[in-house]
UniProtKB/Swiss-Prot annotation:
Cofactor: Mg(2+)
Subunit field text: Homodimer.
Organism whose genome encodes this protein: Burkholderia mallei (strain ATCC 23344)
Protein residues bound to Mg(2+): 23, 50
Protein name as catalogued: Adenylosuccinate synthetase
Gene (UniProt): purA
């Protein structure tokens, strides 16, 4: 009997997105919310960004598998919007299984998910090397070239692995194209056909038990009354369409991508939680109006920025690269809120601001003397933005582990209240430390 026949109330779907340039602390919040979800869904990106979880003092970094895998009994889904490296997937599965977690029986992969192949990685790395000083900061893991193949309708997908002859024919055709680019344009070495074929087909039997029609399964789960959590990677300002182009990632990181990248109707997305760090960070190249510190730029060595980097442990969880740091940019945050239709914010890493004499909030910009209240769309224009700040008194008290609003220092509350006012949406959660218990809940995304 169908769910509708027995009049089951559909479950609630919550989307978690980063509102900055990634690294906002989404992993911890997804893990916290998973207490109230029966499934967690990845809908875009690949293994180029990591989610760091601290549970019981133990650090775990997940790059591809949804954070819900840390909770027994929670189903995890990799949607069609993801680009999948089987090598990275099975490495991560192995690490989790060594830690005693059950993975394969709870992980479901869309048959329409695009595969990352060795030639994607070779092209990614050769292209970035060729750019020299003009590099865009790719992780070199083949994400961008895999998405290029998807848009160019050349991509090999997970379901193609189960027809060896057709897979071989299409692989040979793809290699003819990509090896020409590698050798004749990028000056790299050709990728071997047989070695690639053997490697990829070797994953087929291991993948097959986890492959399913994810779109249908999510529909059925929702209509059976189960809550689903959609876990975004990277951040809105890295979105291929809405970010500081061309210094962006290769996928859509915004809330709307949850519908397309998992195969669910957009009206089924009930609540959008925007994750916002209490300050800003950025990895790699690209404009950053409120920047204070960049390890690679001698002109960006502000001591407060260095403090934020050190106290916040701002190093990429996958690449290890130091992150650039700066004050929270509310004008950029407003842009993200509008694009995503954010229902409420979760402010993370508030504790990193503890001990500062003053805290600044970028509320807009000056461009050629003109006032601008929203982050511009193009990188060239963003680079011309001069930040306009409001200044708040700092707080000397520690906020680490505080789990109620009233227990926060008065100046911390004043800062957060002003962020809400400028952003135009409520702060529904505040993170005061890396552990899942170090959280202030003001409104519950699954219960609003």
């Amino acid at each position: 009997m169908s769910a509708s026949a027995v009049n089951v109330t559909p479950g609630r779907n919550v989307v978690v997105v980063g509102t900055q340039w990634g690294d906002e602390g989404k992993g911890k919040i997804v893990d916290w919310l998973t207490d109230h979800a029966q499934g967690v869904v990845r809908f875009q990106g690949g293994h180029n960004a990591g989610h760091t979880l601290i549970i019981g003092g133990k650090k775990t970094i997940l790059r591809l598998i949804p954070s819900g895998i840390m909770r027994e009994g929670v189903a995890c889904y990799i949607g069609n919007g993801v680009v999948l490296s089987p090598e990275a997937l099975f490495k991560e599965i192995g690490e989790l299984e060594e830690a005693g977690l059950s993975v394969r029986e709870r992980l479901f992969i869309s048959e329409a998910t695009t595969l990352i192949l060795p030639y994607h990685i070779a092209i990614d790395q050769a292209r970035e090397a060729r750019r020299g000083a003009g590099k865009i900061g790719t992780t070199g893991r083949g994400i961008g070239p895999a998405y290029e193949d998807k848009v160019g309708r050349r991509a090999l997908r997970v379901q193609d692995l189960f027809d060896a002859r057709t897979f071989a024919d299409r692989l040979r055709e793809n290699l003819d194209f990509h090896n020409f680019v590698l050798t004749q344009y990028l000056g790299g070495a050709a990728v071997d056909f047989q070695a690639t074929l053997d490697t990829m087909l070797g994953y087929a039997d291991r993948l097959k038990p986890m492959v399913t029609d994810v779109s249908r399964r999510l529909y059925e789960e929702n209509h059976a009354g189960r809550n689903l959590l959609f876990e975004g990677a990277q951040g809105t300002l890295l979105d291929i369409d809405h970010g500081t182009y061309p210094f962006v990632t290769s996928s859509n990181c915004v809330a709307g991508a949850a519908a397309a990248g998992a195969g669910v109707g957009p009206q089924k997305l009930d609540y959008i939680l925007g994750i916002t760090k209490a300050y800003c960070t950025r990895v790699g190249s690209g404009p950053f109006p409120s920047e204070l510190y960049d390890a690679d730029n001698p002109s960006r060595q502000d001591q407060i920025g260095i403090t934020l980097a050190n106290v916040g442990k701002e190093f990429g969880s996958v690449t290890g690269r130091p992150r650039r740091t700066g004050w929270l940019d509310a004008a950029a945050l407003r842009r993200s809120i509008q694009i995503n239709g954010v229902s409420g914010l979760c402010m993370t890493k508030l504790d990193v601001l503890d001990g500062l004499d003053e805290v600044k909030l970028c509320v807009g910009y000056k461009i050629d003397g003109e006032d601008v209240d929203l982050l511009p769309r193009g990188a060239a224009e963003v680079a011309r933005c001069e930040p306009v700040y409001e200044t708040f008194g700092g707080w000397k008290e520690s906020t680490v582990g505080i789990d109620s609003w009233d227990a926060l220092p008065a100046n911390a509350r004043a800062y957060l209240t002003r962020v809400q006012e400028v952003a135009g949406v409520p702060i529904d959660m505040v993170s005061t430390g890396p552990d899942r218990d170090e959280t202030i809940l003001l409104r519950h995304p699954f219960k609003v």
